[in-house]
Regions:
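Conserved, structured core segments of small domains
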Residues: 1-105
């Protein structure tokens, strides 16, 4: 069964950082979702901080729509992995998830 990379976009706002209670609530929602995915979760992953996009022209800030984090899951097909991503509770709040099959090396 192939591994798939979930790349989370959104959630990088210029609002004040969340309170510890807000962070816990968000983490509880995410962990509940991972719990529903069960053994298909290979790596929960981690959130990311704002970064830079590097090209021949130089480096520029990624901005609020940059990568917000990643996870790795197992699925039988890209379609199944996409359906798993669609079930994420933050999709309703505007988060986007790009899904990529990870090629074995």
């Amino acid at each position: 069964m192939p591994n798939y990379l979930f790349v989370y976009y959104g959630g990088m706002s210029e609002a004040p950082p969340p309170t510890p209670a807000q962070q816990k609530k968000t983490m509880d929602v995410w962990m509940g979702w991972f719990g529903k995915l069960g053994k298909t979760v290979v790596e929960i992953g981690a959130p990311t901080k704002p970064g830079k996009t590097v090209s021949k022209a130089g480096a520029r800030a990624t901005g609020k729509d940059g990568v917000a984090g990643y996870s790795i899951v197992k699925a039988n097909s890209l379609g199944q992995a996409v359906n798993m991503a669609k079930s994420h509770p933050d999709i309703a709040q505007g988060m986007k998830i790009a899904v990529y099959e990870i090629m074995p090396m």
